[in-house]
Amino acid sequence: MRMIETIGEQKSVEAATKQRKLELGRDWSGFPDYEAAKQGLRNYWYPVLWARELKQKKPKAIKLCGEKILLQRDSDGNPRALHDRCPHRGVRLSQGKQWWPNTVSCPYHGWTFDLRDGELKAVITDGPDSRMCGKAAVKTYPTEERIGLIWVYVGDEPAHPLQSQLLKNW
């Protein structure tokens, strides 16, 4: 994309932008978030699953913007999202189980991660006293439940409020 070099060209761009705003609603390309999406698709909240489909103790695997993600509810019923790979051997955590509240355990060697912060809480051979606890973790993603959907943010920047991306009445 080239830089605007003259004032005349700048006014022309401003006029086109103003016209585009007037056409809002006629096609999705005029919607402001779609224009901004050209700048970086990761820095948005995405609806990934119907809320009724996400259960406690039953991990769900999704892929969003190239990220493999595990979704699961914690013991309070809140949706949680973690990177879907165990840092030990790369096995998908979504194939594991929840043996203890607020955790998911890798099916390979039983490394157990907290759903809320991704921290390693126990190793099946040593339990919570393992020397690895506090040294390993999986990435977590901001997650919200709104209007019957589970929303996940995988952005590179800090998450903005989901409401700022939704229509006013949602």
Residue ranges of predicted features:
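Rieske [2Fe-2S] iron-sulfur-binding domain
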Residues: 50-170
